[in-house]
A protein has these predicted regions:
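Bacterial N-terminal signal peptides that target proteins for export
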Residues: 5-18
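Bacterial N-terminal signal peptides
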Residues: 17-28
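Boundary at the C-terminal end of the N-terminal hydrophobic targeting segment
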Residues: 29-33
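Conserved alpha-helical scaffold segments that buttress catalytic/binding sites
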Residues: 35-333
């Protein structure tokens, strides 16, 4: 009886050994056929290939991080925005050449597009002017390669050196809770005054400001916006009249640059920012806005700014911003 049981156990052991061996042999093929889990590998935006040498750049989209928050008047932490955006972009990471599939509409967008992450600009804390020169130089190189720049901030002061790199006529579409036309820094560049400088750039022909709200926009900032001739559409007006109120304010343009401050969104949706205001635009409102902007002209660049992960451990601010970015690009390309 013991011999029979021993023989059966031996046969079972042999079968298990064979099965394990087959699994081991199959693992390389299985692994090669699968997308790696999101927790595997070096973090790049959407797991795009990493290409830090801008002289070798050859892509449709180049993602550039600007980890700078020396221009903020609110809670610092935006310097970690690029890292947070890259981390939370892993939720959407896959083979980017396959594009993005929308189940609503049963459609695939941005298929065949080549993305690269070119890393971060080397910033110099407490030396904003030198940092600004580095930002402008990097964006100029991207543009020279006929590649679309996607800039990850950073506080909103980085938008000035980014736009300074362009030499084509631009309409700047500024989505924000704040006008950013305040001159309280006595002429110095910061995240609340960058519009004053952008308006003086030769390439900038029109500035449209969308989503402003709350009690942090003082009469001086409002007066400066009027003096500059910017077109302002508040969040209240968008709530009341619909997204068409914002789209109608954007003129037909040869080229459009979008700067997206995440504090334009309702803080219940996007708490991860340094200077949020109660209220704000809903996801549906901003998403429709993003989808409609390219109907007014050629999209030539964009930035996502004021992401502060210290105020949003959940990461939903960054993930929402990424989704809105994809929807904007899908509408444009």
């Amino acid at each position: 009886m013991e011999r029979v049981e021993a023989g059966g156990a031996m046969r079972n052991l042999t079968a298990v050994t064979v099965l394990v061996g087959l699994i081991i042999l199959a693992l390389p093929a299985f692994a090669g056929a699968q997308t790696a889990p999101t927790f595997v590998g070096v973090r790049t935006f959407l797991s795009a290939p990493y290409e830090p040498d801008l002289d070798k750049l050859h892509a449709d989209f180049a993602v550039l991080g600007v980890p700078f928050d020396e221009g903020t008047w609110g809670q610092p932490g935006e310097r970690y925005g690029p890292r947070d955006l890259r981390e939370n972009s892993q939720e959407y990471a896959h083979d980017l050449t396959e594009g993005f599939y929308y189940i609503d509409g049963d459609r695939t967008v941005l298929k065949g597009k080549h993305w690269v992450d070119v890393g971060d600009v080397i910033v110099y804390p407490t030396v904003p002017a030198e940092t600004g020169e580095k930002i402008t130089a990097a964006v100029k190189k991207i543009l020279a390669k006929k590649t679309f720049p996607i800039i990850l901030g950073g506080d909103h002061s980085i938008t000035f050196p980014v736009i300074r790199a362009f030499d084509v006529p631009l309409t700047v579409v500024h989505i924000d809770a704040h006008l950013d036309t305040w001159n309280g820094a006595k002429g110095n560049l910061d995240h609340a005054s960058w519009v004053l400088r952008v308006a003086k750039l030769p390439a900038v022909k029109k500035i449209v400001q969308l989503g402003m709200r709350g009690i942090a926009n003082d009469p001086e900032a409002a007066g400066n916006a009027k003096a500059l001739g910017t077109k302002v559409v508040t969040s209240e007006e968008i709530h009341r009249r619909g997204v068409s109120a914002a789209i109608d304010a954007i003129p037909r343009s040869e080229n459009i640059y979008v700067t997206f401050d995440v504090d334009s969104m309702d803080p219940a949706l996007a708490p991860g920012t340094g200077t949020y205001e109660p209220g704000g635009l809903s996801f549906a409102e901003i998403d429709e806005l993003m989808k409609q902007i390219p109907t007014k002209g050629k999209l030539v660049g964009l930035d996502i700014v004021e992401v502060n992960p210290y105020r949003d451990p959940s990461g939903r601010t960054a993930q929402t911003a990424i989704r809105l970015m994809v929807d904007l690009l899908a509408a444009a390309f």
